[in-house]
């Protein structure tokens, strides 16, 4: 895909619904591409950024959970997710990041994204809607962490 293809792809995402093409183009120009391989460390999602999966998928897994339920988050082509400067909600050393070998992610630094949001209120609304969706994911992660912690702290035979 070339820049024009990426621009058209991004413009079709709910995040950029009713957002002028010029703003989407500015975000694309100021973003960087992360091309990955399998079994990334969480540090490849290292900065205060908004990430957009352009190709492949990224899976966050908790090694403490039983086989079959280790996946705590999965982002695929077209998904948008924010990560703070310390890896956001995935600070646990038990969380691993697995990306498909063909992964391509657009990393948009948050300060640039924030500046663009100040130019267009619809982008702000779309970003808030995306955060609301991620709050549910965060809550699920918290519940899993809490449940696992309680199991680890339980008295034998209780």
Curated annotation (Swiss-Prot):
Q: Which UniProt keywords apply?
A: Activator, DNA-binding, Transcription, Transcription regulation
InterPro entries given for it? cNMP-bd_dom_sf (IPR018490), RmlC-like_jellyroll (IPR014710)
User: Keyword Protease, does the record have it?
Assistant: no
Give the induction note. Answer: By fnr. Autorepressed.
Keyword Amino-acid biosynthesis (UniProt): no
In Swiss-Prot or TrEMBL terms, this protein is called Probable transcription regulator ArfM
Q: Which GO terms describe its molecular function?
A: DNA binding
Domain of life, per lineage: Bacteria
């Amino acid at each position: 895909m070339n820049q024009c293809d990426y621009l058209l792809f991004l413009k079709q995402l709910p995040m950029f619904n009713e957002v002028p093409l010029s703003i989407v183009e500015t975000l694309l120009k100021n973003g960087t591409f992360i091309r990955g391989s399998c079994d990334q460390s969480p540090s490849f999602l290292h900065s205060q950024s908004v990430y957009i999966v352009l190709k492949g998928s990224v899976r966050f897994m908790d090694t403490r959970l039983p086989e079959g339920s280790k996946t705590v988050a999965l982002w695929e082509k077209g998904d948008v997710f924010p990560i703070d400067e310390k890896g956001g909600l995935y600070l646990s050393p038990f969380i691993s990041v697995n990306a498909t070998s063909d992964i391509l992610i657009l990393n948009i630094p948050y300060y640039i994204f924030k500046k663009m949001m100040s130019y267009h209120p619809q982008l702000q609304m779309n970003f808030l809607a995306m955060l609301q969706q991620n709050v549910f994911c965060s809550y699920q992660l918290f519940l899993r962490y809490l449940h696992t912690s309680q199991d680890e702290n339980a008295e034998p035979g209780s």
